[in-house]
Design a protein with these regions (language model features):
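Short, well-structured alpha-helical segments
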Residues: 22-25, 39-46, 141-148
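Peptidoglycan-targeting cell-wall enzymes and recognition modules
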Residues: 2-26, 30-31, 47-139
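Active-site or metal-binding loop neighborhoods of secreted/extracellular toxin and effector enzymes
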Residues: 131-153
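GGW-centered surface loops in extracellular recognition modules
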Residues: 28, 36-37
């Protein structure tokens, strides 16, 4: 997989970013069982969201509300993620963020902030997105766009 890294990063930083990206891709592929095209699509989104650092602790620039691999926003998905971690006895790690994304994509997260027990993304979005990401006939471009449009927005 071709891993983009920030322009101007030192060789040491580039090595760290590539290591982190490969770790995340491995978790998506081997632990969470996403097909290769979906992994490429999700990784493209993570790259953009983190400025190609692939750092699960990434904070949005200029003090914005985005946090983590998916730049979950404080007051929105980030708060739902915090509740999900507490309910599942997890701590904030790259794996936890990926597991939360996986649960949300499957509609099994139960982290809706005002309607406890419901999926954060509702019912229709997970049904569509989960099907799209596991359809090995879909192109990387389609999976990238579907993930961006349905999960990130």
């Amino acid at each position: 997989m071709d891993i983009k890294v920030p322009f101007g990063a030192t060789e040491k930083q580039k090595a760290i970013y590539r290591r982190d990206a490969n770790f995340i891709a491995s978790l998506l592929l081997n632990k969470l069982k996403y097909p290769p095209n979906a992994v490429a699509g999700i990784m493209a989104n993570i790259g953009v969201e983190t400025g190609h650092t692939y750092d699960f602790k990434q904070k949005q620039s200029k003090g914005g509300p985005g946090r983590g691999l998916f730049q979950m926003e404080i007051g929105g998905m980030y708060d739902a993620y915090q509740g999900w971690m507490k309910a599942n006895n997890k701590r904030d790690t790259a794996l936890s963020q990926l597991e939360y994304m996986d649960a949300a994509v499957k509609g099994k997260d139960g982290s809706h902030p005002t309607d406890k027990g419901r999926a954060y993304l509702g019912t229709n979005i997970p049904r569509y997105l989960n099907k799209s990401l596991h359809d090995e006939l879909n192109t990387v471009d389609k999976m990238t766009m579907d993930f961006r449009d349905k999960f990130e927005n």
